[in-house]
Regions:
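Amphipathic alpha-helical repeat scaffolds of TPR domains
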Residues: 205-224, 251-267, 295-308, 335-347, ...
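Hydrophobic/aromatic-rich core segments of domains that either
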Residues: 128-190
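Short coil turns that delineate tetratricopeptide repeat
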Residues: 243-244, 289, 330, 370, ...
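Secondary-structure boundary elements
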Residues: 49-117
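TPR alpha-solenoid repeat register
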Residues: 248-249, 253, 294, 334, ...
Length: 481
């Protein structure tokens, strides 16, 4: 029996599959859930920081979380002071960035997205620094709008209808393109200037969404190490947290979660752990519901699981898996798998049958199932051809070529487009003509022409289109008369 080939599928995304030696079954539970935060369209500055601490994988109510929150409160106290309030909005917006670098930020590290780590050792990236700037600007009454590009995040403040960008990864990043006077000695003025940047594909996002990018960066990094135990709870919390956002944002967050689910199943499949993979997907659906992408993953996983079982002659296992999981896959995959199992069962049944019995079984399949997959139709036709040829060969081996040709003719009536059967029928008739020729040779050599002609005429009745017999008969009649 031929092996069935796997459908191979990959996830095209920035979140990709890495190597792994051991794999823990991840929990499908969120890292955290605060209903009072998740249900709001807009959060206060302190609620944004609380969410940022949680997304940084620190319990905000723990001693560590409380310490981080208090460090933030100390900064918020400064920006909400009367001294700050007495300045213009533009001055406040600029001074917030200066304050961040004087008190907290010290070293840029591209992948350091955690707010907690930023407060602990001063390392930061565009997301963590933008979250801090946004919260402080919001606390002192500024209108601050996060900005996102495919690879960067920053903030903008709106002051008197003017949109001012703030590149939070640089202490002089307020309003890029303008000069910032530096402290200097000897009455010499010095300036710093950050070139104005024309950001490609920039998009305004919500304040809640900016905070959630902490989680997105983290689970992206975890996926590179196949750390699904950490990636899934983060992605699930992010999805729940963004439920008040637009449909597009919500769908993107759910899609990220489904990508993680899919990558995990691929890892399991690479280890031939199909049943674990299917049970995991069932758990995913029970916990967070299904989507078209997750159903597609489920369908492909079950298909590959059935292929694996059938290639290992485990028809019973394949039927059990199909029975358990078929309701969670697309209908077209249900049809594919059902046909595949049916054919394997049929193939096994055919192993202990005669050719005649096999053809009866194959004919009966048309009354029991309508095949939709071309490869399955071709496989059934190949089996029919095989057993018809076996019947033909049985007669040919006994040199019953006319009977063999009749069997071939019967087969052709059932499979009219089968060129191989037509070729075999013609060969049977040709072999019959050759047999008749060989039969008359000794008669002709002994000059028993009448008997030879009689044999040829009888042969021509059975095989009226035989060129061999006609040629022999014409030559012999000329010679004999």
């Amino acid at each position: 029996m031929k092996n069935i080939f796997f459908i191979i599928f990959f996830t095209f995304t920035q979140l990709f599959l890495g190597a792994t030696n051991s794999l823990a079954i991840p929990s499908i539970q969120p890292l955290f859930h605060f209903e009072e935060i998740f249900s709001k369209d807009e959060l206060s500055s302190q609620e944004l920081i609380t969410a940022a601490i949680e997304f940084s994988e620190v319990d905000s109510s723990s001693p560590e979380g409380t310490e981080i929150f208090n460090k933030y409160l100390a900064l918020e106290k400064i920006v909400t002071s009367q001294e700050f309030a007495n300045t213009t909005e533009k001055e406040r917006a600029s001074k917030i960035l200066t304050l961040m670098y004087e008190t907290t930020l010290s070293q840029y590290i591209e992948n350091q997205t955690k707010l907690t780590t930023m407060f602990q050792n001063g390392t930061y990236n565009c997301v963590s620094s933008s979250v801090l700037y946004m919260a402080l600007a919001k606390a002192c009454g500024l209108r601050v709008v996060p900005q996102k590009t495919p690879s960067h995040a920053f903030c903008s403040v709106y002051i008197n209808n003017e949109k001012i960008d703030v590149e939070t990864t640089n202490p002089y990043g307020f309003n890029p393109g303008t000069k910032h006077e530096l402290e200097s000695q000897h009455n010499q003025k010095k300036y710093a200037i950050i070139p104005k940047i024309k950001y490609q594909n920039r998009t305004e996002i919500s304040q809640k969404n900016l905070v959630s990018l902490i989680a997105a960066n983290l689970y992206g990094a975890y996926l590179k190490k196949n750390n699904f135990t950490k990636a899934i709870p983060l992605a699930l919390s992010r999805m729940n947290y963004l439920q008040t956002e637009s449909e597009q944002i919500k769908n993107d967050a759910r899609n990220d979660l489904d990508i993680i689910f899919t990558n995990y199943t691929i890892v399991l499949e690479n280890k031939n752990q199909y049943e674990t993979s299917l049970n995991f997907l069932q758990n995913c659906i029970n916990t967070v519901g299904t989507t078209q992408k997750l159903t597609d993953t489920y369908s492909l996983t079950l298909y590959n699981a059935i292929v694996y079982e059938l290639n290992n002659k485990n028809i019973t296992n394949s039927k059990n898996l199909f029975s358990i999981h078929k309701d969670n896959i697309f209908s077209e995959y249900q049809i594919k798998i059902n046909e595949m199992i049916y054919i394997e069962e049929l193939q096994k049944e055919l192993e202990n049958t005669t050719a005649t019995q096999a053809l009866e079984l194959l004919d009966n399949t048309e009354n029991q199932i309508t095949f939709t997959q071309k490869q399955n139709i071709n496989r059934i036709n190949s089996l029919k051809e095989f057993f018809w040829i076996e019947l033909i060969n049985q007669e040919s081996e006994k040199q019953n070529y006319i009977q063999a040709a009749k069997i071939a003719e019967n087969a052709i009536s059932k499979m009219p487009n089968n060129q191989n059967l037509k070729r075999i029928k013609n060969q049977c008739l040709k072999n019959h003509g050759i047999t008749i020729h060989n039969k008359i040779v000794p008669l002709v050599n002994s000059k028993n022409y009448s008997q030879a002609i009689k044999i040829l005429e009888e042969g021509l009745k059975e095989n009226p289109n035989s060129i061999e017999i006609k040629n022999d008969l014409n030559r012999l009649k000329k010679f004999a008369y």
